[in-house]
Amino acid sequence: MKSISNILNHILQIENGFKHINDGASEIMEIYSKEQCFELALELFKHEAYQARMLATSILGRLAATNNDALCFLKEQVSTDKNWRVQEMLAKAFDEVCEHRGV
């Protein structure tokens, strides 16, 4: 089992692509409770590295299928991020929300 810092260090080394971000989100979601994942995502979103914010967005997208606070954070905070990669991850997050909520 990788620690959060190991997952984050791996993610920060890769500049392109989404697979490693989604893999990191999956690892975190398997290790921690949904409540812990939500708090972690909020902290990760404050990080200056766009990769960390992408990871936060991926986690929040998975949580937002059933968590209205995560959905609101995506709509109100993530949507204002200026990095296009974070916006791409936001689009994927909303795809997941729509798939699970039936919208």
Where are the language model's segments positioned?
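Flexible loop/turn segments at the boundaries of HEAT repeats in alpha-solenoid HEAT proteins
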Residues: 29-37, 63-73, 96-103
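Hydrophobic face of amphipathic alpha-helices that form TPR/SEL1-like repeat modules
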Residues: 59, 91-93
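N-terminal alpha-helical scaffold/docking segments in eukaryotic complex subunits
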Residues: 1-63
